[in-house]
Design a protein with these regions (language model features):
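Class I SAM-dependent transferase core
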Residues: 1-37
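Conserved SAM/SAH cofactor-binding pocket of Class I
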Residues: 31-107
């Protein structure tokens, strides 16, 4: 049986409560975006992750960039899983999980 988690260098992503699992595409995309934002000359203090799922992309960005991240997830079980993953990481002070529908979220 496959593991219900992915172990990264600085954090672990559990995914047993999420419909959308960690994939190679997600890891590659997260790495690309985190590097692009980290290497940008733009001053970026806040980021928004809509449909955070496990929290993977927020975690990948948090480890590369010193910014605050709001991560929105509509599914209660996935939001709970993301919260667990974030709290267990060294980046919990940089990421805020919000369980709501992004279509009604007040930006």
């Amino acid at each position: 049986m496959a593991n219900s988690y992915f172990q990264f260098k600085q954090f672990t992503v559990h995914q047993d409560k999420c419909a959308m699992k960690v994939t190679t595409d997600g890891c590659l995309f997260g790495g690309f975006v985190a590097n692009a934002i980290s290497n940008s000359e733009l001053v970026i203090n806040n980021c928004l992750d809509i449909g955070t799922g496990t929290g993977l992309l927020s975690l990948m960005l948090a480890q590369k960039k010193n910014c605050f991240i709001d991560a929105i997830e509509i599914d209660a079980a996935a939001a709970e899983q993301a919260t667990t993953n974030i709290v267990a990481s060294p980046f919990s002070d940089k990421i805020n999980i919000i369980q709501t529908d992004a279509r009604i979220f007040l930006f």
